[in-house]
């Protein structure tokens, strides 16, 4: 077939060259955005008298037909037409005649594709924000059910201090809240229109960029046409924000995997989110959590891939920029899928409160309580720290825990120890006393839950 840009050329490309250069296999995902962008563009052209109202109406009727066909998956795309833009233009001309060729007046594929991607990411980021909020709502529900569920808190994957399970869960709530904030902030840069920037230098036609931007729901326009067609910061920012979100999901999944093991038994995954072994009938594998952890690397790769593509590109458009889309599409699909799985997995998991409780009575995570006890009685904390270290050594040598040590032995270590020490050693009491702002104390958790509910109330309503 003859190319819409073929006037300059005397030879046709080989089929394999066409296939190598074509992007329609993946950029057809932008079909709705491409048609909607064209609707706004031709409306603006008519307003400015660049095309007649009659021509604009004919073009819009043709575009509306193609949009309907697209939504019903009836459009047949061709590699020969290269990309989504030329495919749609070719179909439009076939549908309404040569007047369809006037649609591209005052526009280039360079500003057209950038517009499509801005529209696409605006929609997808808003969807990801909503999905993240739904996950946060599940975290709030699990936290509410586990305010007084005591578990070991860890540093270096060693038991450190007793904490509330709700406190641990809410740590991820606030990580996700930062992710939401980053996505929301990025919308300020996504919601800007490059349409009308032309190939790189603007256009000689008297277009109204602000009007077409308004029609598409953008908050403004790019101030520089070179920047408009060559900028992919908005995609990189999306990939970066998504990498951080996936990192948070991956960290949580790592803990869920550990907690569901026989060595911990803190939680049990629902059968819906686990699989078995083809050879070992006893196995219940946390495959969905492992997949989320694994897919995090995939999202990181998409970010670094585009950063590498962009690092040496001169202004303005270069064909290298065709490589901006597949990683973006893949990241959207991956993040949406992981959020959906994570939400269901956390909503259906069973918390083994008894196992968690046993874990904090069979360790030394209450050692800091003794150091604080002595410090409250006037002993310098460093001296208290040394005494408790010796107590832990004594216990490990005897094969006992701090609650098992007699008061007589405690007094041999320091005359400051009294009977009330054993109240301090209770994991429940240890958690309750940590009432500093943001701490694991029950009152602090209740305060945190109120704030968290306020941030997710719109999701709960819907």
UniProtKB/Swiss-Prot annotation:
Keywords: Amino-acid biosynthesis, Arginine biosynthesis, Cytoplasm, Lyase. It is an enzyme of class 4 (lyase). It is found in: Cytoplasm. CDD domains: Argininosuccinate_lyase. It catalyses: 2-(N(omega)-L-arginino)succinate = fumarate + L-arginine. GO terms for molecular function: argininosuccinate lyase activity. Its main location: cytoplasm. InterPro entries: Arg_succ_lyase_C (IPR029419), Argininosuccinate_lyase (IPR009049), Fumarase/histidase_N (IPR024083), Fumarate_lyase_CS (IPR020557), Fumarate_lyase_fam (IPR000362), Fumarate_lyase_N (IPR022761), L-Aspartase-like (IPR008948). Its EC number is 4.3.2.1. Pathway: Amino-acid biosynthesis; L-arginine biosynthesis; L-arginine from L-ornithine and carbamoyl phosphate: step 3/3. This is Argininosuccinate lyase. It comes from Bacillus cereus (strain ATCC 14579 / DSM 31 / CCUG 7414 / JCM 2152 / NBRC 15305 / NCIMB 9373 / NCTC 2599 / NRRL B-3711).
